[in-house]
């Protein structure tokens, strides 16, 4: 029965039962972490053989005859460029292979734009009277942290199952020259798990920005992170942008952080020829080369993009049961109460849960006191301010399958808060 249909007496009885369950959870002294999309130990163990690919007897000369131990090749070795180019569906000349973190590449891209501008800028963003960024919400907290760090004004754009509200995006981008960029996680978005529709990608590619130096930050973090056999597919934005003469408008990012070792993987930028030249010129003042040994290690381990895609099946075998378990428990224990809604993603690392308005912070607090750490309520919005206080991001990847069940079962005890709120309304 939906809670809103219960009498005051039924609500009281249900609340008391929830409190009892919650107290039982607290007494177990659980210490469970669902706060970040971290690979679990089993996933990390999968990549251990990669550490044996190179040793002191290995040839560290790449296919072009480059000794990867030495300086040089700022934008990465050819073999790594080809692997990522095949993965993202672009030409290898469009790839800059960076260090271990795509987040660093994104931060540096904003920093360069603020200090020097981007290709096509008449002046640095930092010398403009105002700089604005569009932020699809709910979204990735670390994206918002970057733009907040640089004092960039962030504007919420609601997400839909097809992607950001493109009517709003077009209105703002095409008419406000202060709008310099937008954050996008186009495939299995964080946290909703939505993949942008073909129409959405085409509308992005066809934007007519009022700012000549507007950029789409296309964070394709989950491009191969499928959970289902009938997985989503994403239209290639560069192919569409070229049709509109807009290929300079896009910065695409990807990494192996959730493929091999987070913090010890390989990250890339994909961009137009003009952007690659502009970025490389500035990057050359900052760096001589990234870790080419690690680039070679990854290439030899996977062989090619198809080898990497096949490897992702192993991740799916570990992650899919955890996601299925969380969805099953939410459905069994909360499905009839009409107080939570959630998505069932086909890939990515998160499940987005929405409470009734005004309840997310309290739910997160109760979870924390019960030993379950969630991403902070509000974190999926700029400035950590969820206007409706309703969105919670669940990250099932890190706990074991058994603990994933424990994590989610605790949510059953949390409607006591909602019971109380509904009873007060009555």
Describe each model-derived feature in a short phrase.
Residues 1-64:
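Conserved N-terminal helix/loop that builds the PLP phosphate-binding region
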Residues 2-3, 8-14, 58-60, 64, ...:
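PLP-dependent enzyme catalytic core of the Aspartate aminotransferase-like
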Residues 15-26, 275-276, 280-281, 350-393:
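Conserved C-terminal alpha-helix-loop-beta "cap" of PLP-dependent enzymes
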Residues 66-212, 223-245, 360:
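Conserved core of the PLP fold type I
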Residues 98, 239-320:
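Conserved core segment of the aminotransferase class I/II
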Residues 313-327, 339-354:
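Conserved glycine-rich beta-strand-loop-beta hairpin in the small C-terminal domain of fold type I
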Residues 406-426:
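Single conserved hydrophobic/aromatic residue that forms the stacking wall/gate
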